[in-house]
């Protein structure tokens, strides 16, 4: 079987695709691959923060279109970039084992959020990271930053920023581990799906789905299902400052979730254990708790997203 894989062309996307291919080959020996490189709107328009472009699934949509058009068999994504709602003709079919779900502060001197110098300039284009950081450090200036990982690190080294906030998983996949300080999910709840690579295929490809499901990590797949159900119930897209992390432990999800306004003035964060027998229901339970405690804030954020 030859599997045509649609992916973005960045170093991180290609590394994630390699992880997927290696995982598939562990469980299916008679498989070959062909890469279909897709350039997305998010790759082309680097002039604005993602939340100002105003397109849902800015990194996901065009890659999935290659599958819908029959040009590729599957699409590979950072699951955190994939909206809760995708085409009805597509489905999430595989997740390799999850990598580190946390956010990380990257600096030249291994600062933590607490030890960042007063009035530091911190780079991120994520409203979620911006809001939770400002809720902890009102003195810092958050400056948007775009581009691939190497570009961002170069801007840090050039002195344009004192620190960056990035996904720990992406740094680890590219073997960037110097001067990295992880941020606790209780302080900055990660984006739903962060640290997970998602593989999407057409619903009607039973032959392909069988191969891919055999290669999937079930624990990670359940965590993905819970977090995406959480995101779906809130009704939020990738540009709402919302975090949700469900980690399986002995039949329960340790679920940490939160929401914050972009200026860090108002936030809600909670951690709880929820029965994991039905991952989608667990995600909805977490979402209902967040809505009970922060309904007004969520409504305002959704209105302007």
UniProtKB/Swiss-Prot annotation:
GO MF: hydroxymethylbilane synthase activity
InterPro entries: HemC (IPR000860), Porphobilin_deaminase_cofac_BS (IPR022419), Porphobilin_deaminase_N (IPR022417), Porphobilinogen_deaminase_C (IPR022418), Porphobilinogen_deaminase_C_sf (IPR036803)
Transmembrane segments: none
Keywords, sorted A to Z: Porphyrin biosynthesis, Transferase
Name of the molecule in the record: Probable porphobilinogen deaminase
SUPFAM superfamilies the record matches: Periplasmic binding protein-like II (SSF53850), Porphobilinogen deaminase (hydroxymethylbilane synthase), C-terminal domain (SSF54782)
The protein's required cofactors: dipyrromethane
Catalytically driven reaction(s): 4 porphobilinogen + H2O = hydroxymethylbilane + 4 NH4(+)
Top-level taxonomic group: Archaea
GO CC entries: cytoplasm
GO biological process entries: protoporphyrinogen IX biosynthetic process
Chain's role: Tetrapolymerization of the monopyrrole PBG into the hydroxymethylbilane pre-uroporphyrinogen in several discrete steps.
């Amino acid at each position: 079987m030859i599997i045509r894989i649609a992916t973005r062309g960045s170093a991180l996307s290609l590394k994630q695709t390699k992880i997927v291919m290696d995982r598939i080959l562990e469980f299916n020996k008679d498989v070959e691959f062909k890469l279909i490189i897709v350039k997305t709107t998010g790759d082309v328009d680097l002039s604005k923060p993602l939340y100002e472009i105003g397109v849902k699934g800015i990194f996901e949509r065009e890659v999935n279109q290659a599958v819908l058009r029959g040009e590729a068999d599957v699409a590979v994504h950072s699951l955190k970039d994939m909206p809760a709602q995708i085409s009805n003709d597509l489905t999430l079919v595989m997740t390799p084992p999850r990598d580190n779900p946390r956010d990380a502060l990257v600096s030249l001197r291994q600062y933590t959020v607490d030890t960042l110098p007063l009035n530091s300039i911190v780079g991120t284009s994520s409203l979620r990271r911006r809001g939770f950081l400002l809720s902890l450090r009102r003195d810092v200036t958050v400056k948007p930053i775009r581009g691939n990982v190497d570009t961002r690190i170069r801007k840090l080294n050039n002195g344009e920023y004192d620190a960056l906030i990035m996904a720990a998983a992406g740094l680890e996949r590219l073997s960037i581990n110097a001067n990295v300080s992880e941020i606790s999910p209780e302080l900055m709840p990660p984006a739903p799906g962060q640290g997970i690579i998602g593989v999407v295929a057409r619903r009607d490809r039973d032959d392909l789905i069988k191969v891919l499901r055999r290669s999937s990590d079930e624990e990670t797949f359940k965590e993905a299902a819970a977090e995406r159900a959480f995101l779906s119930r809130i009704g939020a897209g990738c540009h709402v400052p919302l975090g949700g992390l469900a980690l399986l432990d002995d039949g329960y999800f340790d679920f940490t979730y939160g929401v914050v306004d972009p200026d860090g003035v108002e936030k809600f964060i909670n951690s709880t254990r929820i029965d994991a027998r039905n991952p989608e229901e667990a995600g909805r339970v977490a979402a209902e708790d967040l809505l009970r405690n922060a309904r007004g804030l969520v409504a305002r954020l959704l209105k302007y997203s």
